C-alpha cells in the first residue's frame, strides 16, 4: 500500500525491499503496480530490482510475465530474466529474451537487446543483434550498437559501418560511430 500511496524515495525503496523479501507471493502485486498508469519511472526501477531478486525463486512466474498483454510488465520481466540467465544458465529465460527481440513494443525490444549485451557471448548472438541495427525504433538501434560494443563483438565492425552510413538519426549514428571506434581498438 505504501508503494502506491507514498512518494518518499526511502519509503518506496523500503516497500520494494520488503516486497522482494516476501518472495514469489509478492510478484502479482508488483506486476499489478506496473499496470497502474500513475506508476512513476522511479517505482518501475524499484519494481525491476525487486523482480530480479524474486526471479530466481519464481522463474516460471517471470517467464509468464514476459508474455503479459502490458508492455511495461513485459519490459520488467525481460529485465529480471537477466539474473536467471547469468546465474542459473536458464535456457528457457534466454529463449524468452531472444523472442522479445521481435516484440511489438520498442521498449521490450530495447530491453531485450540490452540484456543480450550483458548476458551472452558475442559469437552466439552477434548475427541476431546485427539485424536489430535496422530496427524501426531508434532506441533499439542505439541499444544494439551499445550491446555489440559491450560484447566486444569485433566481427560486427563491417555491419556497424554499413549501419552508420545508412542511419538517418544523428544520435543513433553517433552511438554507432563510438561502437565502431571502440571495437576497432586493437584490431
Regions found by a protein language model. Give the residues of each.
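Structural signature of tandem alpha-helical TPR/SEL1-like repeats
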Residues: 88-94, 123-124
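Short inter-helical turns and helix N-cap capping residues of alpha-solenoid HEAT/ARM repeat scaffolds
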Residues: 7-8, 38-40, 69-70, 104-105, ...
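Structural detector for internal amphipathic alpha-helices that build alpha-solenoid repeat scaffolds
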Residues: 2, 10-24, 32, 41-56, ...
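TPR/TPR-like (Sel1-like) alpha-helical repeat modules
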Residues: 158-168
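Buried hydrophobic core positions in alpha-solenoid tandem helical repeats
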Residues: 1, 29-31, 61-63, 96-98, ...
Amino acid at each position: 500500500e505504501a508503494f502506491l500511496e507514498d512518494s518518499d524515495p526511502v519509503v518506496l525503496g523500503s516497500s520494494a525491499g520488503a516486497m522482494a523479501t516476501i518472495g514469489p507471493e509478492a510478484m502479482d502485486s508488483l506486476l499489478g503496480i506496473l499496470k497502474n498508469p500513475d506508476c512513476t519511472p522511479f517505482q518501475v526501477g524499484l519494481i525491476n530490482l525487486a523482480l530480479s531478486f524474486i526471479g530466481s525463486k519464481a522463474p516460471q512466474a517471470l517467464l509468464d510475465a514476459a508474455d503479459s498483454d502490458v508492455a511495461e510488465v513485459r519490459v520488467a520481466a525481460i529485465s529480471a530474466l537477466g539474473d536467471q540467465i547469468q546465474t542459473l544458465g536458464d535456457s528457457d529465460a534466454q529463449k524468452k529474451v531472444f523472442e522479445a527481440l521481435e516484440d511489438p513494443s520498442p521498449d521490450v525490444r530495447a530491453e531485450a537487446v540490452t540484456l543480450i549485451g550483458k548476458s551472452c557471448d558475442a559469437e552466439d548472438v552477434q548475427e541476431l543483434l546485427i539485424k536489430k541495427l535496422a530496427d524501426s525504433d531508434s532506441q533499439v538501434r542505439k541499444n544494439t550498437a551499445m550491446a555489440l560494443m559491450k560484447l566486444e563483438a569485433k566481427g560486427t565492425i563491417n555491419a556497424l559501418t554499413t549501419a552508420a552510413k545508412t542511419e538517418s538519426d544523428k544520435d543513433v549514428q553517433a552511438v554507432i560511430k563510438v561502437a565502431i571506434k571502440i571495437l576497432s581498438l586493437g584490431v
